Amino acid sequence: MAKLSKRAAAIAQKIDRTKLYPVGEALNLVKETATAKFDESIDVAVQLGIDPKKSDQLVRGSVVLPAGTGKTVRVAVFAQGEKADAARAAGADIVGLDDLAEQIKAGQMDFDVVIASPDTMRVVGALGQVLGPRGLMPNPKVGTVTPDVATAVKNAKAGQIQYRTDKAGIIHATIGRASFGVEQLQNNLAALVDALQKARPAAAKGIYLRKLAVSSTMGGGARVEIASLSAN
């Protein structure tokens, strides 16, 4: 058996991988084991009771985390005229249309989120091969293709995250940083879980929230007692 590193050994002493922890305790343990020299992200993995092979059971959407993400988000907006002015007023970092498309084609992508007004999709649609693989392609399902670009910009800046099930039916998301308080992380997690519950596909059968675990970038992971989510 391979010898554990000092960090891994310390984590193994604190977190029992076979145990289900109440959500507050799980988050506290993950924070305690996030000892890297940078502010580690706190992540969550949620196993949903869906069939990921069926398109009508895929779960995708977005939610604004009440305590934010702890990250400064740069937002690019495809808009023109009054919508472009509204996007700038809302705090968008880059606003344009054909000029923005040319920047992206040239590999200049100094942004984290792309928002588009519906009337610009004729231009944005041609960028799918560039934006798609990076998870940046605007999509109405997550609120990034919308006539109300100003609200979309404000949401992105306020800590909106996007989520979608992977091939195994698992949602992966970041709910904050190790520097956040447990209550902040708990509130963010509650907002995500609430959004997932509301996005439950009609075709999904049986238990919907199957498993949930929280972890940090370099630290340990703790499994969460599902019942404790509704007890808080």
From Swiss-Prot:
PROSITE patterns: RIBOSOMAL_L1. InterPro entries: Ribosom_uL1_bac-type, Ribosomal_uL1, Ribosomal_uL1-like, Ribosomal_uL1/biogenesis, Ribosomal_uL1_3-a/b-sand, Ribosomal_uL1_CS. Keywords: Repressor, Ribonucleoprotein, Ribosomal protein, RNA-binding, rRNA-binding, Translation regulation, tRNA-binding. It holds the Pfam family Ribosomal_L1. Gene3D superfamilies: 3.30.190.20, 3.40.50.790. GO terms for biological process: regulation of translation; translation. One of its GO terms (cellular component) is cytosolic large ribosomal subunit. One of its GO terms (molecular function) is rRNA binding. The keyword Ligase does not apply. Signal peptide: none annotated. The keyword tRNA-binding applies. Belongs to the universal ribosomal protein uL1 family. Part of the 50S ribosomal subunit. Binds directly to 23S rRNA. The L1 stalk is quite mobile in the ribosome, and is involved in E site tRNA release. This is Large ribosomal subunit protein uL1.
